[in-house]
């Protein structure tokens, strides 16, 4: 057996992925399933239902779970449902999050709380209820979605910068606390990635007027926005969710068995 075949495999593993209805979360679920994992796809919407069905058609077990990651009761019930459906949990990907493109001066308390609750509190709650299971099972892997914003601030995005910095700090803290239980905890720090969240960012900043261009003018503005997102990084191109998902695969696999507490920057060089 080749080294890559032995280590890049998730055969027999069960992975929970939050925010799995679209974007990076969906790409992670699809890639994990491709490499043998059964995937529990968690989202506040019903988007996961159809996508889980598509994964099952490929011969891998997948199931959608509707959950509000900001509600401890919802999270607890979801983790219990995953255990009932799959029997064990080996991998947790805390990916759910939103972006608010405003400065401290412009951000309302409600916007601040919502960004914090989904991106940071949700990471805390799922970890709180999954880690005891991993301890009983002798170990596990947690991969959190942070951002390049945790390292280099994004202009006019105070809540988002704070949330992602918090996710990176929480990652390090959990790595220290749970290493003795054979639980590895890392985070991935993407840059601008072509996902629905990036489209939301363009709409919030007024750089585009629609995420579904219908006229030549709308398409030109959309293309210019996407192109501009890659202009200021050394690779001079924007990344895709599928490309980012491979870093999550690496961190979930035995290929990274000595890595914990790390922040893995995958941003085309923006933070260089």
Name each model feature, range by range.
Residues 103-104, 111-116, 229:
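Substrate-binding pocket helix/loop in short-chain dehydrogenase/reductase
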Residues 127, 163, 171:
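Active-site helix of classical SDR
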Residues 132, 176-177, 257:
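Alpha-helical segment proximal to the catalytic Tyr-Lys
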Residues 147:
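Residue(s) in the substrate-gating loop at a strand-loop-helix junction
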Residues 124-127, 135, 235-266, 271:
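C-terminal substrate-recognition "lid" of short-chain dehydrogenase/reductases
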Residues 14, 21-22:
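Conserved glycine-rich cofactor-binding loop
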Residues 179, 184, 259-261:
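Short, small/polar-rich loop/turn modules that mediate ligand/substrate recognition or access, typified
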């Amino acid at each position: 057996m080749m080294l890559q075949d032995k280590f890049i495999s998730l055969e027999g593993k069960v992975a929970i992925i939050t925010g799995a209805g679209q974007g990076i979360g969906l790409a992670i679920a699809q890639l994990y399933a491709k490499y043998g994992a059964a995937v529990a796809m968690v989202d506040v919407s019903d988007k996961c239902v159809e996508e889980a069905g598509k994964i099952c058609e490929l011969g891998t077990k997948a199931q959608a779970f509707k959950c509000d990651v900001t509600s401890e009761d919802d999270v607890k019930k979801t983790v219990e449902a995953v255990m009932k459906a799959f029997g064990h949990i080996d991998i947790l990907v805390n990916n759910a999050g939103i972006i608010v493109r405003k400065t401290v001066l412009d951000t309302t308390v409600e916007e601040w709380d919502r960004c914090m609750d989904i991106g940071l509190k949700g990471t805390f709650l799922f970890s709180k209820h999954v880690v005891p299971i991993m301890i009983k099972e002798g170990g596990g892997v947690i991969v959190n979605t942070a951002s390049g914003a945790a390292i280099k601030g994004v202009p006019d995005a105070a809540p988002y910068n704070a949330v992602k910095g918090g996710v990176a700090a929480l990652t390090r803290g959990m790595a220290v606390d749970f290493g003795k239980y054979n639980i590895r905890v890392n985070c991935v720090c993407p840059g601008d990635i072509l996902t629905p969240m990036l489209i939301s960012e363009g709409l919030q900043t007024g750089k585009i007027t629609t995420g579904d261009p219908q006229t030549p003018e709308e398409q030109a503005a959309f293309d210019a926005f996407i192109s501009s997102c890659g202009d200021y990084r050394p690779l001079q191109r924007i990344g895709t969710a599928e490309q980012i998902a491979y870093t999550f695969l690496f961190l979930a696999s035995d290929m990274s068995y000595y890595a914990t507490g790390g922040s893995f920057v995958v941003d085309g060089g923006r933070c260089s």
